[in-house]
Amino acid sequence: MKRLFSIIAAIIMVAGFAVAKDKEAVKCTLTLLDGKTISGYMVDYKTKTNSYGADKIITINTVYIANNPGEAGTEYSANDAKKIVFNTGSEDIECLSMYILRNNSRPLNLKHGNEKGFMNVVYKKDGIIGLASNAKEVFFSTTPPVMKIPTYVVSYCVEGDEVAVPYWIPSDANSIGAKTGLRYCFERFPKVAEYIKGKDFKIKDLKDDPLSILNKVVELK
């Protein structure tokens, strides 16, 4: 449960970096692809929406960094960066610049779109990285035709990858065939896929700790 709270807290904190004119800019350090670092204040940003099934993953894809709060910032694209680290005063929050696995494609191929986004690092162990993002669950109904409910998505990547594989959204706990879908998400790791298929694994295990499956990846990979 503590891990679930830490995921949500990290996402909310980055979501709170939506810098309106009456809010304080946040300190950050951006690392570009060539290794150069840009330090300053993020004074604005833009977001990008990616599909995850019928749901939508929301990531920051453009940041504006200035030397001082209140100044106009220089624009930087996530496509040109490795990561950005936000300094909140009490802790640093690392966000990697990642492509997201193309909707309805297989993790074995790591196919992706053309635009990266920054994703919160919430797990890092033995070359396996867990990432969290804001999202909206999409529900089709008669009134209104579509409802979009704020939520979060957890993804993973192998260290050195540029593509994040989404594997968990809270509504998955109630989805028919959720174990099959999760097994595909981890098909790069045959032993993990077999573990998910087996009787010892329950989807509800991820409800309170979506990162617990990554410990199993580290153990079995």
Residue ranges and their predicted role:
Residues 24-33:
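A short beta-strand micro-motif
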Residues 28, 38-42:
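Conserved glycine-centered beta-strand/turn positions repeated across beta-sheet architectures
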Residues 41-193:
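Aromatic-patch recognition
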Residues 188-221:
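C-terminal partner/receptor-binding element of secreted or periplasmic proteins
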